[in-house]
Amino acid sequence: MNAQPLLPRIQSPADVRRLSRAELKQLADELREFVLQSVSRTGGHLSSNLGTVELTVALHHVFDTPEDRLVWDVGHQTYPHKILTGRRDRMSTLRQLGGLSGFPRRDESEYDTFGTAHSSTSISAALGMALAAQQKGEKRHAVAIIGDGSMTAGMAFEALNNGGMPHAGRVPNLLVILNDNDMSISPPVGALNKYLARLLSGRFYAAAREGAKSVLKSAPTLFELARRFEEHAKGMVVPGTIFEEFGFNYVGPIDGHDLDALIPTLENLRDKPGAQFLHVVTKKGYGYKLAEADPIAYHGPGKFDPQIGLVKPATPPKTTFTQVFGQWLCDMAAADPKLVAITPAMREGSGMVEFHKRFPERYHDVGIAEQHAVTFAAGLACEGLRPVVAIYSTFLQRAYDQLIHDVALQNLPMVFALDRAGLVGADGATHAGAYDIAFVRCIPNMSLLAPADEAETRRALSTAFAHDGPVAVRYPRGSGAGTAVETGFETLPWGRGEVRRQAGGHVRGPRIAILAFGTLLYPALAAAEKLDATVANMRFIKPLDAALVEQLARTHDALVTVEEGCLMGGAGSAVLEALQAAGLQTPVLTLGLPDQFIEHGDPALLLAACGLDSAGIEAAIQKRFCASAPSHLRPVANG
């Protein structure tokens, strides 16, 4: 091994392409150690990045990036890619406000050819790039790197179906790399597979195959027999028949940590025309024993000491909203045998581990397939079961037609537990739950609740489960106010909010009522203390408590709505619609997320930047209303 470190000398992939095979292996070792040390200091995705080190090195060595396009599916496994493409010195800013994104972004680097974070988009995007190159007469390569988990989504197969077809007379030059890190569809990887990969990707095999085809096509029966024999022979040692049927030349599986296998295979596939499919097998957490042993725990850890590993905090943290949901789900399942739970590959993130253990026959993980998850749940509801779909707010976007056509149109009794609603912090714009209020409340038959804290979240879930129709309950990532959660199934009065703070009888300025939706109730209450304003905990976005809105409008000089969602079509819009229907012209200030994508960073900092912390709410109200004349309206007691 070279005594001098190689990684500090790598300023771009051009430097990687100059290295020898031995140096590439050394670089991979240094890169893996750098990823481990870096993520341990910043937090972030670890297991997946440790598993893609050799593949990343090989890709940048073989392909002329950024002229050749690499499209990484999901994108949370791109830390090695970022490090090799000139961003090593900025890794200390990863996922922080103003720092590097945890995902590929076109505005961050020319090497990030396509922005990703949601799954199963890479093949479609790479195919578009390949066809664009073909149409413009440019001789560059397009490569999609997709994990086996992402292959469960229909979009990936839609792209494969299209990618192997001739376009303008020929199949585009597209390479799809299946990064199989779960061994779920792989036979043992050994010398035979390595040899076969080199053989099937090589020029001699391709030339012999095409030559034999041209001869045998003159005798159709012999050609069909030969085709079946080839398919059977390859199927004995490789599981690629389905990809061959899509029109791809399948190669693999090969060891994704073996540069001696990866590099010659990639070179062969680079030089072959048409649609190619390479199956590589990797191991999540590779090279760090603790992550190899528990890749789920090390999927997205916070800061930790690599020598010790993850350590449980001495004092247990506050209960999270996700944990409240998980406990409610188990309790309700014990009480009602009709409850079934569905998740699109988010068992841990959605708090369903315990439910899976206790009720395995009523637990359905459908994989990364949100469209299927929603319609599958609709089918369960049609047969009298009570499905609960646990899904992140941002991922429900992927099943919007199913939500309308298959659920709401039939008014099926279902619960959608929308985790990660609002700002999500380090994952940034791609994962923000900013739009669910707007896109759910406009659907007929759909109801939407926004509980203010942990205790109310449990009651909201029970309320939704008891309702005869589709209901979504939105709640944020992390913990809330720390309220004690009861163990029963108390419900909320349907469609009713409550006044949590009443303004005093002698307000100096205009009488203000703040209508808070969701967890922003607490910063609204803090702001109201300084303003002596009324605060309503609205609870329901749809059906909106129009009677409470009208009452507050008649007894206050102005209303302020506060929500952790986009303003266009949001809860504030619902209040304005209610006032219009009542013929009231009370001034309204709507506060929420601005009309822009919110960057990654600490959630508290992001909330403050959006003016949704207590100081921001107070300042916005002061600026808009508090120079007005004193009010002559009298308060009305909470009904």
From Swiss-Prot:
> Example GO molecular function term?
1-deoxy-D-xylulose-5-phosphate synthase activity
Of the GO CC terms on this record, one is: cytosol
Q: Which GO terms describe its biological process?
A: 1-deoxy-D-xylulose 5-phosphate biosynthetic process; isopentenyl diphosphate biosynthetic process, methylerythritol 4-phosphate pathway; terpenoid biosynthetic process; thiamine biosynthetic process
Binding of Mg(2+), residues:
148, 181
Keyword entries, A-Z: Isoprene biosynthesis, Magnesium, Metal-binding, Thiamine biosynthesis, Thiamine pyrophosphate, Transferase
User: EC number(s) of the enzyme?
Assistant: 2.2.1.7
Task: Name the coenzymes or cofactors required.
Answer: Mg(2+); thiamine diphosphate
- Part of which pathway? Metabolic intermediate biosynthesis; 1-deoxy-D-xylulose 5-phosphate biosynthesis; 1-deoxy-D-xylulose 5-phosphate from D-glyceraldehyde 3-phosphate and pyruvate: step 1/1
The keyword Cell cycle is annotated on this UniProt entry:
no
Q: How does it assemble?
A: Homodimer.
The record's comment on protein family reads: Belongs to the transketolase family. DXPS subfamily.
Q: What is this protein called?
A: 1-deoxy-D-xylulose-5-phosphate synthase
